[in-house]
């Protein structure tokens, strides 16, 4: 809460049963060019994840976006005090964690705590009872109903829930007086920090979904844990929308690369190449991803731990495909409803007030 109190930019809080991460990433993608912003990593929206996210703020961003997730009454009170959002975006309402609430209305009441001090509110009236409750409770603040905004054509975004998410992003941009978003397609959220076997006995860490300083720091830390005794290669693209001058930006990047023990850098893009002198490790640079695929030095691959970290425009998925070891597809189906049932069964056997800690084993997340 203290760290948040020092921040002078605009803070956005996103809550709802589903769609928080998708809408957060979509909003970040549609922000005005050149704006320095921060968004919480992955799905850091819990009682632990939110404080960690706030502590990652550098302090000079214009906009910060956080998710807030709850599983029982009382949790949003704490999250609201930490985030203190100026703008709140409500996504959908559903049955997630319903076992800890008397009814859906109680859950909506809990979620609306996040907006008690917000000056701007965005919601979608399709999602009842949340929509009606938000409209009534915050009528004096004239909340933005996303249902009033044009629906993206089905030919562009086929999924109805994704089209409603797009309307929420439209409403947010209108509330903030940003240019209207230009939707090309629905955003996809592939598994970040995906580890695969690479060619030439390498390990490939694919985190090519987005790129900013915060996510780069997290990815480099992950590389350190995966690499063990292997030498480390970073494949990095130009970074856009940092809000920093190129000299300051790539100076920071060079420091992060050095501290992470990266000994080979492959830079893609003209801005990185112009700042090649900042990097003390072995390095090579390419104008485009396609050129890199065609000319990459095999020394940078064989037996190494390779981190792919690129902005979406650079299409690093093509590079990941080129460097990945070919294998047959294996499908693992996980029944989350069954997992929830099992967790609640064992919770019912515990004494009242006993807390649970869930651990996801190794790199399975």
Where are these regions (language model features)?
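Extended, hydrophobic interaction surfaces within ordered domains
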Residues: 1, 170, 214-222, 229, ...
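Phosphate-binding loop of NTP-binding sites
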Residues: 1-120, 129-135, 299, 321-327, ...
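Residue-level signal for inorganic ion chemistry
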Residues: 14, 50, 67, 79, ...
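Active-site beta-loop-alpha junctions enriched in small/polar residues
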Residues: 17-19, 69, 126, 209, ...
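Hydrophobic "anchor" residues on beta-strands that sit immediately upstream
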Residues: 63, 87, 120, 203, ...
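Nucleotide phosphate-binding/pyrophosphate-handling subdomain across enzymes
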Residues: 78, 155-260, 340-357, 363
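Acidic, Mg2+-coordinating active-site environments of NTP-dependent enzymes
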Residues: 86-203, 229-230, 255-264, 270-283
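A charged N-terminal "starter" segment
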Residues: 304, 315-365
């Amino acid at each position: 809460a203290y760290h948040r109190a020092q921040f002078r930019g605009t803070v956005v809080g996103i809550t709802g049963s589903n769609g928080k991460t998708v809408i957060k990433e979509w909003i970040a993608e549609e922000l005005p060019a050149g704006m320095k912003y921060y968004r919480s990593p992955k799905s850091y929206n819990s009682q632990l994840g939110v404080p960690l996210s706030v502590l990652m703020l550098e302090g000079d961003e214009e906009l910060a976006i956080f998710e807030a997730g709850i599983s029982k009454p009382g949790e949003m009170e704490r999250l609201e005090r930490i985030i203190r959002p100026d703008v709140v975006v409500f996504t959908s309402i559903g049955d997630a964690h319903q076992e800890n609430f008397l009814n859906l209305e109680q859950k909506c009441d809990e979620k609306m705590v996040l907006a008690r001090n917000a000056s701007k509110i965005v919601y979608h009236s399709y999602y009842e009872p949340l929509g009606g409750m938000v409209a009534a409770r915050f009528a004096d603040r004239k909340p933005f109903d996303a249902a009033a905004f044009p629906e993206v054509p089905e030919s562009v975004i086929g999924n109805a829930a994704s089209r409603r998410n797009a309307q929420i992003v439209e409403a947010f941009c209108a509330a903030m007086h940003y240019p209207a978003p230009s939707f090309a397609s629905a955003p996809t959220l592939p598994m970040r920090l995906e580890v695969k076997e690479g060619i030439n006995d390498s390990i490939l860490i694919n985190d090519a979904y987005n790129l900013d300083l915060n996510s780069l720091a997290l990815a480099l830390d992950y590389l350190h844990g995966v690499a063990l005794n292997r030498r480390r290669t970073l494949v990095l693209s130009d970074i856009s929308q940092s809000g920093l001058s190129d000299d300051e930006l790539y100076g920071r990047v060079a420091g992060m690369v050095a501290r992470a023990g990266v000994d080979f850098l492959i830079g893609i893009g003209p801005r990185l190449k112009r700042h090649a002198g900042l990097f003390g490790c072995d390095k090579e640079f390419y104008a485009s991803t396609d050129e890199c695929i065609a000319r990459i030095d095999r020394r940078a691959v064989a037996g190494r731990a390779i981190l792919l970290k690129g902005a979406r425009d650079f299409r690093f998925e093509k590079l990941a495909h080129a460097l990945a070891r070919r294998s047959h597809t294996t499908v693992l189906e996980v029944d989350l409803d069954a997992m929830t049932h099992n967790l609640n069964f064992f919770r019912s056997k515990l004494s009242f007030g006993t807390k649970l800690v869930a651990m996801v084993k190794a790199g399975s997340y």
